[in-house]
Curated annotation (Swiss-Prot):
SUPFAM superfamilies referenced in this protein's UniProt entry, alphabetically: PRTase-like
Keyword Nuclease in annotation: no
Record-given protein name: Orotate phosphoribosyltransferase
Residues annotated to bind orotate: 34-35, 128, 156
PANTHER family, sorted: OROTATE PHOSPHORIBOSYLTRANSFERASE 1-RELATED (PTHR46683:SF1)
Primary gene name: pyrE
EC number from the UniProt entry: 2.4.2.10
Biological process according to GO: 'de novo' pyrimidine nucleobase biosynthetic process; 'de novo' UMP biosynthetic process; pyrimidine ribonucleoside biosynthetic process
Pathway membership, UniProt: Pyrimidine metabolism; UMP biosynthesis via de novo pathway; UMP from orotate: step 1/2
């Protein structure tokens, strides 16, 4: 695990974005941990979040021309990632996002920001069922752009309805790489170094045995 990944886990724990316990997911599964990126909700949180996203992007080595943040959660993520890339990596790249509702005055259409063209890096918080990605792909393709990759904060590395994860489905269906700041594997590695969190480690490992990919 790289230093920025460890720092991201500690940041998420400090903001209670990442919690351990027993949680019922939308799928009905009982999970020993929960991740709610909506709790990154202050200026400082966003500034830090952008740095972690930018670090993961640069680390991935994937080449892209533009950041796209799907409405609504992807909008602040794309914005802060663009700022962090410019400030900390000297990469001044365009970004844009979509509106859920098209506008009939002012800037036309359902896109805000830079023109959606070239190789697009889609940034979002998590992929649960992959629905937001599929909707975004329609927008990207309609504008003649291509998907370079997808960046999210956490890859839960668990099966969807079938034998593979929603992330693996996205990679298969769109022939692109999905990268994440951290994965379930990183989370387990972090817990292994924290003896005081042994009960959480056991629960997370048991969950991975049952639902992991």
């Amino acid at each position: 695990m790289k230093p920025y990944q460890r720092q991201f886990i500690e940041f998420a724990l400090s903001k209670q974005v990442l919690k351990f316990g027993e949680f019922t997911l939308k799928s009905g599964r009982k999970s020993p941990y929960f991740f709610n990126a909506g709790l990154f909700n202050t200026g400082r949180d966003l500034a830090l979040l952008g740095r972690f996203y930018a670090e993961a992007l640069v680390d991935s080595g994937i080449e892209f021309d533009l950041l796209f943040g799907p409405a609504y959660k992807g909008i602040p993520i794309a914005t802060t990632t663009a700022v962090a890339l410019a400030e900390h990596h000297d990469l001044d790249l365009p970004y844009c996002f979509n509106r859920k509702e098209a506008k009939d005055h002012g800037e036309g259409g359902n896109l805000v920001g830079s023109a959606l063209q070239g190789r697009v890096m889609l940034v979002d918080d998590v992929i649960t069922a992959g629905t937001a990605i599929r909707e975004s792909m329609e927008i990207i393709q309609a504008n003649g752009a291509t998907l370079a990759g997808v960046l999210i904060s956490l890859d839960r590395q668990e099966r969807g309805r079938g034998e593979i994860s929603a992330i693996q489905e996205v990679e298969r269906d769109y022939n692109c790489k999905v990268i994440s700041i951290i994965t379930l594997k990183d989370l387990i590695a972090y817990l292994e170094g924290k003896p005081e969190m042994a009960e959480h480690l056991a629960a997370v490992k048991a969950y991975r045995e049952e639902f992991g990919v």
